[in-house]
A protein has these predicted regions:
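Residue-level signal for inorganic ion chemistry
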Residues: 63, 116
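Short SAM/SAH-binding signature in class I
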Residues: 27-35
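Flexible, glycine-/basic-rich loop-and-beta segments that form/coincide
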Residues: 118, 123-157, 161-188
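Short, glycine-/aromatic-enriched active-site segment of Class I SAM-dependent methyltransferases
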Residues: 64-80
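Conserved S-adenosyl-L-methionine
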Residues: 101-112
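S-adenosyl-L-methionine
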Residues: 1-27
């Protein structure tokens, strides 16, 4: 309530974020932070791209339980397989790239979701002149420690359906490196 009653906050209750446009919120913005539930980010990324200025930064939280499909979510609504979590982040990043939202980095939230799900922040920058779903492009990102490959030896819930196993993600090495680092460094 404190946030809603702050005079600096412009509340848009009853707004479907999938249909959001810059003119709905007083013009294009420079930053978007999104923590959405019960919807795939891929469904709202077009609205985000339509609501930001070129060069804007976006920080959406990827919640794998809403990205992998209900048939691949474990008991209690938790995605336990790290490869499925990595796949969820990858698919959102690829969809973002097709809209000119370039991945700069990926980091795991240090706090698991209420049910224990591990969630991830994507740092995206809007570069409308670089939207290209055939060849993934990256902005420069801060360098960090080298990730480990420890989780890759664990079996996936359905390995034949993961994008790494079926070759869908070939050619996206740098993106996978960022994702695997985030999965490796995140909560277990």
């Amino acid at each position: 309530w404190r946030l809603q009653s702050d005079e600096r906050v412009d509340v848009h209750d009853r707004t479907n974020v999938r249909h959001l446009r810059g003119e709905d919120i007083g013009g294009l913005v420079d930053i978007v932070v999104a923590d959405l539930s019960f919807i795939s980010l891929s469904l709202v990324l077009p609205a985000f791209a339509a609501s930001v200025r070129p060069g804007a930064d976006l920080l959406p939280m990827v919640k794998p339980q809403f990205e992998v499909g209900k048939e691949r979510v474990g008991s209690g609504g938790v995605v336990r397989d790290p490869r499925l979590r990595a796949e969820a982040v990858y698919r959102v990043a690829r969809d973002a790239a097709s809209l000119g939202l370039m991945t700069r980095d990926v980091v795991a939230s240090p706090l698991p979701g209420p049910s224990g799900n591990v969630e991830y922040f994507l740092w995206l920058t809007y570069r409308p002149d670089e939207n290209d779903s055939a060849e993934y492009r990256f902005d420069e990102r801060p360098t960090g420690e080298r990730h480990t490959d420890a989780h890759r030896s664990r079996p996936a819930a359905r390995a034949d359906d993961t994008v790494e196993e079926n070759g869908e993600g070939e050619g996206d090495g740098r993106l996978w490196e960022m994702i695997h680092r985030a999965v490796d460094e995140g909560p277990r």
